[in-house]
Each structure stands twice: as C-alpha cells, then as structure tokens.
C-alpha cells in the first residue's frame, strides 16, 4: 500500500440533502462530480461528541483540525469548562482565587453568545457570579458575535446579559463587535478602537441595549458594532484584574498583547496591565496564569511522520494557517524536524465575499510544488467555503465552492501523475446552508456531516460511522507507518 499522501481539508463544505440555499449544490463543480463517480467516498461526523464537543454542538475549525491531526477525540475546553462550572471546581480554581484576592476591581471580557466556537454565554455569566459573590467590583465587557450565531441575535443575548448584571449588581461597561475586538490578522486599527473603549475613551451612551438597536436601525449587525461604553464607565485602572472568557485563543491573542505586552510597538498605549487571567493558554509567550491548562497531546500525525524521518508540508492562507500548524499539531507551535510550512497571505479585503476565491489558487500552487518536490505528506486547507460562508452572501459562496473545485481538480491530477494517494474531507460544514426556511441569513457553521474521499492503493470502500478522528490513522496506513495506540482506527 505504501504511497506518499496529500490530505486536503475543504473548510466549511458539508453535506446537506436540502438543496435550497445550499451553495455547494448550486455550484458548478466538475471535479467533485468526478470524485463522487470514481473515488471511494463516505460521510464523516464533525459535530458534538464525535469531536469532543457537547451533543448537538456544531464543530469548528480549531476542534476539527485538532481531531484530524491527533487522530483521537479530545474533549474540548468547552466540555471541560462546563463540567468545572457544574461541579463548582471553577470557583475553587487557584489562579482565579489569587486574582480575586489581589484585585478589588475585576473586568470580564469575552464574546457573548451561545455559539460555542470561541466562548459560551454561560461561562461569562458563571464568572460574573463567582467574582460578584466574592465581593469584588465587577465590570462586564461584552463582544457581540453575529458570525457563529445569526447576525442580529445579539439583541436577545445582550438583553439577557444586561438583566443578569443588574440582578447581580455588576456594571455592564462596554459593547463592541468581534470585527474590532477579535481581529486576528494584525489590523491593529480595529483592536485600537476596542483598547480605547476599555480605557473609557469610546462613544458614551446611556443604554448599551438601545445603542445596539440603534446600530441595527443603521444596518450595522452584531459582528460590526462600533465600540461604545456606558456613560458611567470611567475605564480600566492599571491595578485592576482582567479575566478573558474566550476559551479559543486565536482571536484573543492580539487584544492580550495590546493590554499586556511591554514590547508592543503598533500604536501608542496609555496603560499596560499586569493582572490578566485567560481561560486557556492563548500563547506560550504571554507567560500569564490560565484557568484551564493545555492537555498534553503526544503522538500526533505530524509527530509520527517526523519521527519516522519523512518530510511533510503544511500549507494554507493566513485565515487558516494556525489550523494546519498549531491546531493540527496538537496545540504545539514549534516546527518539527523535516516539516515545512508555507503561509499564503489572505487577500486584504473587508469581508471575503468581495473576493470569494481568496488565495486558493496560490495555495493550490504551493501544494503542486510540494508534490513535484516529493514531500512524503502534505496537508492543505482551503478556507473559502467557511470564510465566504460566514459572510452570508449566497452568490459569493457559490463562487467560493467553484474556486475550491478548480483547485481540487488540479491537485488530484498532479497527485495521480506523481503516484500520490489523497484524502479529501472538511473540518465542518457552513456554505451548504446559507439561509433558514424563513429566509434569515445563516452565517454560522452547521452540524451536518462532511464528505470524505480516499484514493489510495488497495482502498475500495470506507467503513461506516467514522469521524474526523479516523483520518490520521488512515494517512499512516497509506504511508506504511505504525499507528500509535492513542489513535482511533483508520477509515479503511
């Protein structure tokens, strides 16, 4: 069976039997049609317990890539935190107790929705309650979502938070859309707006809920809400404690850097803060206390390949680069021996419906070069289905699928020419459901299964009831390497 192997992850493309508002179905996709006819294929589960999330919870890119790259189901921070709240372990957390003892005033910052991709509203409320009951003066700083949940669902979430704060005697201090507060592409002007808001230098309003409604009236939805503060809020003091509620790291790193790093040079800052506590490890370089330490994940797919002395290439455009490196490698940033990484810059547009092909063709070229060079294993992510799916623009999402389809055709042809096996799958769905029955835009991920195609010597059928955690062992089987005991079985 021994062959070199390409693993292609088509981010945000899932299977939905309903063809209405389904960008995948509506797209012209000759490469996919050929794959369905000629290559063994099946469906994989990408949500809920199959990827270590609560039952019914949609999958996401971080979880999906960790599952694919580690070859096992890792119970995600979302599940770990839920359990810690239920069994009262969170309030006993040593790092939390230290912060609450040291700082009279405490600020809680995070994405406030039930999307479950970056955070959970229940975690935010649990933390407010713990801090308030401890006797600290508490300030809530809500970031509105509109991306992992529907674009105007913020009104109900923020109404809920406002009432919760009033009942607890907590200050509801600021409001801002994730477009600004949670940028991850070094657009520092956006983060600066939020930083100034936290310092009490933003647009002042008497009622943040009314401000949100007013934004809707001006056609500004949750993701893009401009930073505003309650008129009574006077800003953070340097001695205050700051707790970050998001358990996913990639969209909080820049904000933490702005608030805490002594070496930050992107813009002038009036204050730097020392008393920070993050829900999970955002970046090892921060040296900050955390509530939930990283679980050690050993014997990942990339590690096994590296230890065997084989070469590997990991490539994607900026938006998904962390997923094929950090997350795919089990939450480890460092480069392995014989591992090459190629980062293709994502286009500098406000939202990706403006350029639905994104940088797919450049990513495709990097893969073909890797095949021609003879890399033993290549993993690539095409971001289009997900990133364009998030915009809610149906026609742009169709173009996104078509761009991916073109790239698949080229890579498959190149793989066959050089006798490479290939596996094509997705980390989760998105663009296959762009509106609900009522015509509301759906910008979030789905809980649908995803396709998997396996072209390799000796493979004619894929087992039933498989998931993303079965892919790593499949790659090792193709490469003729031993499958470690930590991994789930192969797809075939």
From Swiss-Prot:
Family the entry assigns: Belongs to the BPG-independent phosphoglycerate mutase family.
Keyword flag Manganese: yes
Reaction equation(s) it catalyzes: (2R)-2-phosphoglycerate = (2R)-3-phosphoglycerate
Cofactor annotation comment: Binds 2 manganese ions per subunit.
Catalytic machinery residues: 61 (phosphoserine intermediate)
Pathway where it operates: Carbohydrate degradation; glycolysis; pyruvate from D-glyceraldehyde 3-phosphate: step 3/5
Gene label: gpmI
Name of the featured protein: 2,3-bisphosphoglycerate-independent phosphoglycerate mutase
Top EC class of this enzyme: isomerase
HAMAP family given in the database record: GpmI
Pfam families: iPGM_N (PF06415), Metalloenzyme (PF01676)
Residues involved in Mn(2+) 1 binding: 386, 390, 445
Superkingdom in the source lineage: Bacteria
Entry function: Catalyzes the interconversion of 2-phosphoglycerate and 3-phosphoglycerate.
Record text on subunit structure and interactions: Monomer.
GO biological process, one term: glycolytic process
EC annotation from Swiss-Prot or TrEMBL: 5.4.2.12
Gene Ontology MF terms: manganese ion binding; phosphoglycerate mutase activity
Binding annotation for substrate: 118, 147-148, 178, 184, 248-251, 320
Keyword terms of this UniProt record: Glycolysis, Isomerase, Manganese, Metal-binding
Cofactor(s) required, per the database record: Mn(2+)
Organism listed in the record: Campylobacter jejuni subsp. jejuni serotype O:6 (strain 81116 / NCTC 11828)
InterPro entries: Alkaline_phosphatase_core_sf, BPG-indep_PGM_N, Metalloenzyme, PGAM_B_sf, Pgm_bpd_ind
Binding site for Mn(2+) 2: 11, 61, 427-428
């Amino acid at each position: 069976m021994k062959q070199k192997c390409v693993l292609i992850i088509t981010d945000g493309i899932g299977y939905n039997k309903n063809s209405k508002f389904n960008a995948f179905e509506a797209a012209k996709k000759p490469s996919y049609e050929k794959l369905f006819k000629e290559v063994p294929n099946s469906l994989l589960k990408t949500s809920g317990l199959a990827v270590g999330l609560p039952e019914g919870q949609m999958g996401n890119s971080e979880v999906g890539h960790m599952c694919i790259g580690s070859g096992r189901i890792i119970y995600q921070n979302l599940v770990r935190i839920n359990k810690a709240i239920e069994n009262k372990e969170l309030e006993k957390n040593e790092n939390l107790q230290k912060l609450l003892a040291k700082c009279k005033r405490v600020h809680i910052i995070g994405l406030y929705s039930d999307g479950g991709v970056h955070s959970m509203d229940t975690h935010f409320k649990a933390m407010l309650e713990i801090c308030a009951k401890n006797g600290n003066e508490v300030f809530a700083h809500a970031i509105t979502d509109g991306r992992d949940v529907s674009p105007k669902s913020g009104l109900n979430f923020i109404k809920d938070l406002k009432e919760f704060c009033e009942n607890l005697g907590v200050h509801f201090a600021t409001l801002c859309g994730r477009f600004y507060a949670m940028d991850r592409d070094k657009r520092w002007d956006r983060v600066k707006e939020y930083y100034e808001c936290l310092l009490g230098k933003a647009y002042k309003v008497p009622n943040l809920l009314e401000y949100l409604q007013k934004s809707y009236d001006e056609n500004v939805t949750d993701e893009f809400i401009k930073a505003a503060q309650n008129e009574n809020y006077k800003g953070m003091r340097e001695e205050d404690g700051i707790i970050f509620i998001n358990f996913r790291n990639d969209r909080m790193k820049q904000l933490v850097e702005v608030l805490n790093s002594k070496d930050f040079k992107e813009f002038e800052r009036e204050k730097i803060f020392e008393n920070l506590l993050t829900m999970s490890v955002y970046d090892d370089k921060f040296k900050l206390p955390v509530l939930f330490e990283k679980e050690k994940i050993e014997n990942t797919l990339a590690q096994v390949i590296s230890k065997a002395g084989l070469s590997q290439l990991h490539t994607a455009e900026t938006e998904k680069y962390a997923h094929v490196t950090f997350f795919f490698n089990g939450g480890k940033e460092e480069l392995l021996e014989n591992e090459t990484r190629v980062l293709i810059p994502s286009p500098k547009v406000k939202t990706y419906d403006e350029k639905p092909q994104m940088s797919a063709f450049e990513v495709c070229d990097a893969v073909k070069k890797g095949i021609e060079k003879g890399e033993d294993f290549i993993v690539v992510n095409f971001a289009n289905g997900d990133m364009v799916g998030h915009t809610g623009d149906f026609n742009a999402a169709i173009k996104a699928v078509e761009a991916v389809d073109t790239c698949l055709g080229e890579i498959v042809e190149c793989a066959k020419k050089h006798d490479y096996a290939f596996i094509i799958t997705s980390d989760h769905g998105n663009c296959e459901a762009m509106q609900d029955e009522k015509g509301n835009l759906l910008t979030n991920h789905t809980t649908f299964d995803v396709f998997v195609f396996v072209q390799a010597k000796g493979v004619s059928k894929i087992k039933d009831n498989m998931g993303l955690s079965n892919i790593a062992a499949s790659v090792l089987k193709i490469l003729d390497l031993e499958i470690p005991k930590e991994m789930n079985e192969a797809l075939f």
